[in-house]
Amino acid sequence: MAFTPFPPRQPSSSARLPLTLMTLDDWALATISGPDSEKYLQGQITADVSNLTDAQHLLAAHCDAKGKMWSNLRVFRRDGGFAWIERRSLRDVQLTELKKYAVFSKVTIAANDDLVLLGVAGFQARAALAPLFAALPDAATPVVSEDATSLLWFEHPGERFLLVTDVDTANRVTDALRGEAQLNNSQQWLALNIEAGLPVIDSANSGQFIPQATNLQALGGISFRKGCYTGQEMVARAKFRGANKRALWTLSGTASRVPEAGEDLELKMGDNWRRTGTVLAAVQLDDGQLLVQVVMNNDMEPDSIFRVRDDAGSLRIEPLPYSLEDA
């Protein structure tokens, strides 16, 4: 029996978020298994999975030969192989690309829609989950596995948990939290990812950016010491030759509409407006505030004013919860 997604409601900012249980249907799961799974994945993505323990997860990019990202992936070990979470809109394309050379390796690469992705965040999220599992992940142990469940811990913008689990456990968690937690869909998790400065690559922006343009180097998503992987030459060139001139920014403010992924924004230049950037994701919160994640030049002035194209509202830069200085 399939798990029924929760109905949508306007997302809240992390500062005002009550205990919330979310179905993450806009994200999707994929796996690689088999004797060559580690070697194969290591040759395809930007992060070093050979050093990944069972208690860790990491962000990585899967690039084309030009170093442009098909997708970014949240990778962790599961069931003797690896699993990763990415946006559902581009999973099929990403898996098609990943499988291109798999015929030469002993691996099985597959989408997995049998398992359920849940998010738990907001007021006293840890206390709410604690009675339901023997142990919860934390900063020292960001992944905990229990039976069919992988629990992933995230620090920003406030402590939150991502559960990869079977339908029975998802129903058990939902039944336990239904009375005290508000229910929501993927949009709330998306809003939290935007606040956290975690890049959201959907199909509209697949194949458009090198990893550094979305701050992956600052998020531990690129190893410059590992062996070859697809697109490595271009990714390395961006670092060592200073070829990357873009960065991911979080903006907040107001607008009469929510911009789509792939749109540009406008930057105020004196009395005029100039088109700039590419929107990765945007969400309107329950207080009317608009959050926008956008890739722009990495030398933007912190007091710059932006707007959704031809809109009366305005957007300003929000600080990221991590530094780009040494990235």
UniProtKB/Swiss-Prot annotation:
GO terms for cellular component: cytoplasm. Its main location: cytoplasm. It is found in: Cytoplasm. GO terms for molecular function: folic acid binding. NCBIfam families: PRK09559.1, ygfZ_signature. Folate-binding protein involved in regulating the level of ATP-DnaA and in the modification of some tRNAs. It is probably a key factor in regulatory networks that act via tRNA modification, such as initiation of chromosomal replication. This is tRNA-modifying protein YgfZ. It comes from Klebsiella pneumoniae (strain 342).
